[in-house]
Amino acid sequence: EMISQSERYGIYHFSFTDSLVNGSMKAYRDFVTKLAEYNSTAENKISWDGQIITRGIKAMTAEDWRLTALSGADDLASGVESGSERVRDHMKKQFSNQDLDEFVHEAHKNGVTLQFLMIIGYPTETDEDFLETLRMFKRYKKYDNLISRVYLGSTLGVLPGTPLATEHTHELELNNGENFWVYDKNPTLTFKERVKRSIIAGEEDGIHNW
């Protein structure tokens, strides 16, 4: 479809906004293989961006990354959320710090830029968890120009009826506002503390922040 539309309308860049492009690795491999083959001979090469799941090298291989680059991928956004495995496990993100390191390394090796989507001030985030996020930013500074944007937002808001609010209804006090919640098991993580952490993270990552 992308090839057909590009040839018909002269549009060569596409953005995916409603799903994770590598949710099914079989479908993803078919996708990048076809685009890589097309781009190898096309006068006007296709490029694309979208949201992608962070996967380690066993799940998303070196060959997958090579084809990803040849398919025209760039500025892929991934929900990294936190530098702490413990926090991500609570979110059910299902990838380790090693997976993340491999993901970032392969993206850099193949010249595919990334965007990090972050959540600062998740209810279970301790001081040490937050420090792990800061250490993650420091760790990736060696990859020059790899991470084009880090989206920090303000701080985590919790809405009534969402899974987070429902699953922790007895420990999470919403206090009539999505930003003013208090988690009884982590009471020092106040709204003021969460905002402070967001500011510190923005100063530490050294990248563009929104």
For the regions a language model picked out, list residue spans one by one:
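Conserved SAM/AdoMet-binding glycine-rich loop
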Residues: 1-115, 120
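Short, solvent-exposed turn/loop segments enriched in Gly/Ser/Thr/Pro and often Arg
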Residues: 17-23, 53, 120-124, 151-164
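Active-site glycine- and acidic-residue-rich loops that bind
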Residues: 56-59, 124-133
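C-terminal accessory regions of radical SAM enzymes
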Residues: 128-210
